Every structure is written in structure tokens, then in C-alpha cells.
Amino acid sequence: MTEQTTSPTLPKPGQPIVFRNGTVVTVDDTRSVLADTDVLIVGQNIEAIGRGLAVPDGTFEIDATGGIVMPGMIDTHRHMWQTAMRGYGADWTLTQYFVWYYLEHGKSFRPEDVYAGNKLSALDALDAGVTTTVDWSHGLRTLEHGEAALDALTSSDGRYVLAYGNIFNGPWE
């Protein structure tokens, strides 16, 4: 028996999108939560929120039944370059973290390692509903490391602020 898979259909650039029948968290002044509600997006704007919305011809429809529709979240403190070492040292003290991440492992990171960590972290954030991130990129040894971090972010969907930091000028010196 062979299993056949199909790629999901994605909206075309500029195509209007409507989320149908979701639980909508509005984050407006009333902090409304609306059940079984549609959200119409045209371009980068939310054009309408309501039940049974009439939409333009050719609108891409997403069935949001059982799901939550809300604006993207903001993460103001993420060390994206460290994603490549996720879970490593999870039981360390803060002192061990500084010594091993910075003085041992962090200093062996190449620009391509920083790129991989930032790219993976960007994808991970988007998968969790985070669309804006401040990257506390304090493990950068050279300009090339900084450029790799920036390249990973600019080639990823989402919004990012790169908070550049140099590993050689840590608080322990």
C-alpha cells in the first residue's frame, strides 16, 4: 500500500484571505472573544471581522473551525543564535551557563552556526504564533557572525530587531 501525500495549497501573493468560523481574539479596547467568526484580510490589512462575511471573488479560504485567530504575538527577549544548542545545559546554574555557553561553546560558533540557529529560531517562533521578535544576539564574535545573524532574519518571514552583542565583551571581564 502506498501513501499519497499532497502539498497544501497556499494563497498567492496579494490574494485576499478569509479565516472562517474561528474563535477570534480581537485585542481591541473591549478585549472581545468572538466564537464562530470570520476574518477577512486584504493585502496587509484586516478588512472585516464578522459572521458569514461576503468576500471578494478569488479569496483564499481557511477553515478555522476549532482554532483561534488572533494577531501575531511579540517576543521581546530571545537568544536566537542559541537555538542550535536548545536543551543543552538546561539544568545548569547561571554561572555554568555563562562559562560554558560563552567561554567554551559560544566561542566555537562559526557564522554558519549562528545563521542556522537564527533561522531555526525564526521558524520556531512563527510556528508558535510569534511574528515579531527581538533577537538578543550577544554571542557574535566577528562582523561575519553579525551578518550571518542578520541574513537569517532578513530571509525569514516575520519582523525582527537584531540586538547586536559581542561575546568578547561580556560582563565577567
Q: Which ranges hold each PLM region?
A:
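Residues that scaffold the ATP/ADP-binding catalytic core of kinase and kinase-like folds
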Residues: 27, 49, 83-84, 97
